[in-house]
Swiss-Prot record:
Protein name as it appears in the record: Heat shock protein HspQ
Coiled coil: none
HAMAP family per the UniProt record, alphabetical: HspQ (MF_01194)
GO BP term, example: response to heat
Gene name of this polypeptide: hspQ
Family listed: Belongs to the HspQ family.
Amino acid sequence: MIIASKFGIGQQVRHKLLGYLGVIVDIDVEYSLEQPQEDDIASNATLRSAPWYHVVMEDDNGQPVHTYLAEAQLAYETSDEHPEQPSLDELAESIRHQLLAPRLRN
């Protein structure tokens, strides 16, 4: 079964509501964590059956934070350069480079 996702691994995105910049590091075809809490966005069955993304963002101190977000929570990021968050630019570039030129392992 092939599921189309709106975003790809290594792509920079923005959280629609909060505006945070992030980098997609993995994609699940549907919600795959433990049972969601009732007040969680994941309690919506329609959203649970759509793609979910593992996204690295930065906290207020510039430390990486792993988030798990529904496709509906994300928006395209038009710029690849963010002087205020260069580590996310570097992460996105590194992931894209690895996807284009994977290392062979014995």
